[in-house]
């Protein structure tokens, strides 16, 4: 009964969302496809259902591994199911700590994490025998202080946090879960989420370009007051909240319906693109002066 209620609730919410975004006719057709199992949304719903039904399990154990890293080569992360944090360390060696939670014990946890050099890049992730064996996985990756050529991170269900690091290029994709960057700098950044919030927090800076897109979720952008930009935004259903003093706004469409526009500040040397199919976009500022 509980599972049925959960399923109906999810379908109802999705039906409302699709109706708002695409109209009653398209929304009804998509819901019928979901019920028939033929929609692209089915995989996403299965992930959400699995995440909910797992609940919180007992602590099963943890693994720790060290690995060499070369800042001149790309770092690539791939996790189907995990809350991932990428952090800086004053140490010269890189490491990955993983904590596992579940309802039943799992043999040989030490065989799950991997750090492999392939095609000129460092690949980090987990070889999970069965996602259903775990209720939660937390991953902490520590990288020595340096400017890395590139970071490419993919997370299926979970979250991604990157803090106090520097990159040439940074690209992330999270299907279900939030993405947050703190005190991080990069030449170019692209953040994508299917269902989840995107946050670019105080202290994070971009030299050339920043792109943030979520299908369902909010976008929060904190920008340094001295960094000139030209920002293009588009919102399917939601509103723009601009608290960046001095930014010139050009908006088309109503505040609560489909809208798009541009904001500019300073020399406009940095390109920013923000889009949310369903969700709000918030823009704030911070000072780099001490």
Protein language model regions, located:
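Short acidic/polar N-terminal linker immediately downstream of export determinants
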Residues: 2-108, 130-144, 180, 247-269, ...
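Repetitive beta-strand solenoid architecture
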Residues: 71, 80, 118, 135-137, ...
């Amino acid at each position: 009964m509980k599972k049925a209620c959960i399923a109906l609730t999810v379908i109802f919410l999705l039906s409302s969302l699709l109706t708002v975004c695409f109209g009653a006719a398209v929304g009804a057709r998509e819901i019928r496809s979901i019920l028939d199992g033929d929609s692209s949304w089915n995989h996403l719903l299965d992930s959400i259902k699995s995440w909910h039904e797992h609940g919180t399990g007992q602590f099963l154990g943890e693994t720790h591994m060290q690995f060499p890293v070369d800042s001149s080569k790309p770092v690539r992360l791939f996790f189907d199911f995990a809350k991932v944090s990428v952090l800086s360390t004053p140490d010269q060696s890189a490491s990955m700590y993983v904590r596992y939670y579940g309802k039943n014990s799992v043999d040989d946890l030490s065989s799950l994490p991997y750090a492999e050099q392939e095609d000129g890049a460092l690949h980090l992730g987990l070889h999970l025998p069965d996602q259903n064996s775990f209720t939660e996985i937390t991953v902490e990756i520590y990288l020595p202080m340096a400017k890395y050529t590139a970071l490419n991170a993919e997370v299926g269900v979970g979250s991604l946090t990157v803090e106090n690091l520097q990159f040439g290029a940074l690209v992330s994709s999270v299907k279900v879960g939030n993405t947050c960057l703190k005190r991080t700098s990069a030449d170019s950044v692209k953040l994508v989420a299917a269902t989840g919030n995107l946050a670019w927090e105080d202290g994070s800076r971009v030299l050339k370009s920043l792109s943030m897109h979520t299908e369902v979720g909010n976008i929060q952008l904190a920008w340094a007051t001295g960094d000139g930009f030209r920002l293009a935004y588009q919102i399917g259903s939601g509103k723009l909240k601009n608290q960046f003093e001095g930014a010139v706004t050009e908006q088309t469409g109503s505040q609560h319906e489909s809208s798009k526009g541009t904001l500019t500040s300073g020399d406009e040397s940095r390109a920013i693109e923000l889009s949310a199919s369903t969700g709000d976009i918030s823009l704030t500022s911070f000072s780099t002066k001490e």
